[in-house]
């Protein structure tokens, strides 16, 4: 039985959506069990223990307000979930708690893969090409970025794209303000030259507006810029949905026309719905550590659990270790 440790505390809406997604997930995946970590009384409002659902009492919520170093030593649901992976009682951990606390605790407990300098947050974005995904990293784990980080992230993400997303010889690019070699900061230019000489299928710089074109499989970016890209994309998709809804309900004729276009609108919204992904990998650690959004709903949590399942089934950490040796 494969096991996922799921910290269901610290999100925006309580444990209900996380628990319900877990129940749906184990029903579809009889070879998996989930350990729900959190306030047992709250969790038991929505489920009892079963052969596939276990509950670990750990009601305290991790917060970076307590100090990042200090929070990693405290008793909270996040640390309890991470400890299950460290103690080999779980194959992976998922949490939607405080990002800073999660990254720090995971670094101190799970540790980095041998030779990896810094982990990165890596979501899997949908693109405008049907069934085509792109890996984008780092989206906020590191405010300062060195050339070596970008090189290592490119290598790890290429392996991930190949083994998890089944992309043959993934195309990689560095996100920059332009595609010309002379543009960007010094670390952009140096990393660009080094990646040209590497074994990666590197195509050069990529502008942010082209990330969702579907022509690239891996987009590597500094953590500050990546976080801006992530939040801008989420906001743009939500704004677009709102504008379309307002526009098609303005007149009676548009409402009638919208009925005929309903399936097309639904397909487009589904293709760009980030909830189908639901999470970002903490890439570069010596274990499967996945971070979901604090505002996740049922659908987003289900997408996150599916991501974790893919990583476990592909034995992605073993693949990383073998490749990095």
Swiss-Prot record:
InterPro entries: FA_synthesis (IPR003664), Phospholipid_synth_PlsX-like (IPR012281). Its EC number is 2.3.1.274. Pathway: Lipid metabolism; phospholipid metabolism. The lineage of its organism: Bacteria, Bacillati, Mycoplasmatota, Mycoplasmoidales, Metamycoplasmataceae. One of its GO terms (molecular function) is phosphate:acyl-[acyl carrier protein] acyltransferase activity. Keywords: Cytoplasm, Lipid biosynthesis, Lipid metabolism, Phospholipid biosynthesis, Phospholipid metabolism, Transferase. The keyword DNA damage does not apply. Belongs to the PlsX family. It comes from the Bacteria. This is Phosphate acyltransferase. GO terms for biological process: fatty acid biosynthetic process; phospholipid biosynthetic process. Catalyzes the reversible formation of acyl-phosphate (acyl-PO(4)) from acyl-[acyl-carrier-protein] (acyl-ACP). This enzyme utilizes acyl-ACP as fatty acyl donor, but not acyl-CoA. It is found in: Cytoplasm. Gene3D superfamilies: Isopropylmalate Dehydrogenase (3.40.718.10). It catalyses: a fatty acyl-[ACP] + phosphate = an acyl phosphate + holo-[ACP]. Homodimer. Probably interacts with PlsY. One of its GO terms (cellular component) is cytoplasm. HAMAP family: PlsX (MF_00019). Pfam families: FA_synthesis (PF02504).
């Amino acid at each position: 039985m494969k096991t996922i440790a799921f910290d269901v505390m610290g999100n925006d809406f309580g444990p209900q959506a996380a628990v319900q997604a877990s129940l749906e997930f184990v029903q579809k995946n009889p070879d998996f069990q989930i350990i729900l970590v959190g306030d047992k009384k709250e969790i038991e409002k929505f489920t009892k223990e079963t052969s596939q659902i276990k509950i670990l009492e750990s009601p305290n919520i991790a917060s970076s307000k307590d100090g990042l170093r200090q929070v990693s030593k405290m008793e909270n649901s996040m640390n309890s979930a991470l400890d299950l992976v460290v103690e080999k009682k779980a194959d992976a951990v998922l949490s939607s708690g405080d990002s800073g606390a999660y990254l720090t605790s995971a670094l101190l407990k799970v540790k980095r893969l041998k030779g990896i300098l810094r982990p990165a947050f890596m979501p899997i974005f949908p693109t405008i090409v049907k069934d085509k995904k792109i890996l984008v990293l780092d989206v906020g784990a590191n405010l300062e970025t060195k050339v070596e980080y970008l090189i290592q992230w490119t290598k790890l993400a290429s392996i991930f794209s190949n083994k998890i997303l089944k992309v043959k010889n993934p195309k990689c690019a560095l996100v920059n303000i332009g595609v010309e070699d002379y543009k960007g900061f010094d670390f952009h230019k140096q990393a660009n030259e080094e990646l040209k000489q590497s074994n990666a299928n590197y195509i050069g710089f990529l502008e942010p507006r082209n990330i969702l074109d579907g022509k690239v499989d891996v987009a590597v970016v500094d953590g500050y810029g990546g976080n801006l890209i992530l939040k801008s994309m989420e906001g743009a998709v939500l704004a677009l949905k709102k504008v379309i809804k307002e526009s098609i309900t303005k007149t009676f004729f548009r409402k009638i026309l919208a009925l005929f276009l309903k399936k097309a609108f639904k397909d487009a919204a589904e293709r760009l719905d980030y909830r189908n992904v639901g999470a970002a990998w903490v890439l570069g650690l010596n274990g499967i550590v996945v971070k979901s959004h604090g505002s996740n709903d049922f659908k987003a949590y289900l997408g996150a659990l599916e991501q974790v399942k893919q990583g476990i089934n592909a034995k992605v950490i073993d693949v990383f270790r073998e490749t990095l040796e």
